[in-house]
Amino acid sequence: WSPTYITISELFRNHSEKVVGDSIKLICDLHKIFTECTGIEESLDHFYGWGQLMLADFDDIDKNMADADKVFCNIKDYHALDDTSYLSEEQREMLKKFFDSFSDNHDTELKRRFVSLWSHFGDIYHSYNKRLEEQGIGYEGAVYREVATNKDIDFKYDRYIFVGFNMLQKVEQQLFETLKKQDKAFFYWDYDKAYMPDENQRNSNCAGHYIAMYQQQFPNLLDCERDDIYNNLHRKKQITYISSPTENAQAKYVSKWLGSNDRIKDGRHTAVVLCNEDILQPILHSLPDEADKVNITSGYQLGMTPIATLATHLLNLYTTGNRSKRNSYSLQFVNKVLRHPYARYISQQCGIIAACLQQHRQFYPSHQTLTDNGNDAGLCMLFPNSDYWNTAKGESANSKTAANATLLRQLCNVIKTVGVNAKDVKDALFQESTFRMYTVINRLLSLSECGDLDVDTTTLRRLIKQLVDSATIPFHGEPIVGIQIMGVLETRNLDFDHLLLLSCNEGNMPKGVNDSSFIPYSIRKAYGLTTIDNKVAIYSYYFHRLLQRSTDITIMYNNATDNGQTGEMSRFMLQFMIDSNFDIKHQSLLTQNKIATRKPT
């Protein structure tokens, strides 16, 4: 017998009749509602970025169970603030400061545009949720809120044990409280006494702020006086801070670091943590041969893979390079596809055809020439004739949608062919990236066929690029064997003996601590939404909790000040230097991975 393990997300989703919609579908529906409510005709690819921002705001409102009508009240409408009895004095003061900034007579154009847009947000929020509900779907926050407020849910298990939480959103607090009242909820908190506030709530470190706040409401099932659990940060540790001139230099240093102190031998007790996950690729190329067992939980960017390059070449070929009226294609785009390394999985003749075209300087080769007069099935699939492109347009009332569906279907066919013909290739990155690319394009095809994705081809191409660039590929390794390579979020609730943090700069750790939101800070603060302060406290906890049981710690940061970089170590590194009594070694990484020891400033 063993207990059932689920994430908090699965717990919410399992008790809702709604399904959480995928991000592309959610943005497409939001785009339609936005256009209806505002009358602003914005192309989907231009809308996509701030559609994500708007969706994140709606998600935050629901996860923190705020009243959307009060959050989005009219800035010029002061009587909307008449009833503020539910707000604290501090919250009322925050609101007053914000609304006062809109009462002067020096309106700027930006301010007028913001007020105009803001006045529609409440309508967009309600209309959007209604549209999604009619389809039986919702964004994550809406689903969570529905579950948190539903008093009739039958929780089937006798016990729910919540392990390793830090900051709780209002929906989580509500769910915990519901289960606690049913005597079904038990809580295990993971922290260290070193960063917890004292009885008077005094501590310059915000890492333990939220756990200290929740422990009275949700008591710890573990004995808080056990030093083996809650008093580890002060224990003996070897700690080194290393400054580096570049990110690539840090990646190359990984091999040297792994080669000492039995770090490779200790396998799963060794972790390389990426505060900036963009350096994953150079790290993978720098791993020593002895490190034959590695588990990678950090996602690899789909846009940096060969299959993404092939998809780009295919898009260019089938749009800019397509001479469907002449039943031919432009050699410039044909060559890039035929010479791509994955072209051989479509047809073994690709290289031969490319050489022949170059030799005879056929700048607009016909379908017959490209397909060996129709005798090569792979090439026939790769270079469809003009009938393929024109038939769908003639059969459909909406030629734009039909053309997009045809284009997306063709991309799916080619990518699927590559995957099927290369199924015996052992390269995990190849297999994962090909599958991920297929799922992205196939999802767009589904949305196009059902009419949810109604855009022109130019917009579609830009949208595909945005989606591919933002998509990541999950690596499937063995979590209990080998060296662990992961991002900061993947380290939650895990302990390691040997720890190497890379790119631990201010801006990476804490990560993304900015108010990327339509909702100004003052209003977010007043209505209990997520703010910069919350994000800093969350990352402070991640950082200090990761160090607390480790004994061999190396933290690297980039000291370069070019290309907009500040060259600053993370604020958490500085705070740890001040708060702890450890003799931290300070070193600099020089050329050829040589190390120079220096005294701290």
Task: Walk through the language-model features, giving the residues of each.
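Nucleic acid-machinery interaction/catalytic patches
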Residues: 1-522, 581-594
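Accessory/regulatory regions of helicases
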Residues: 331-336, 505-601
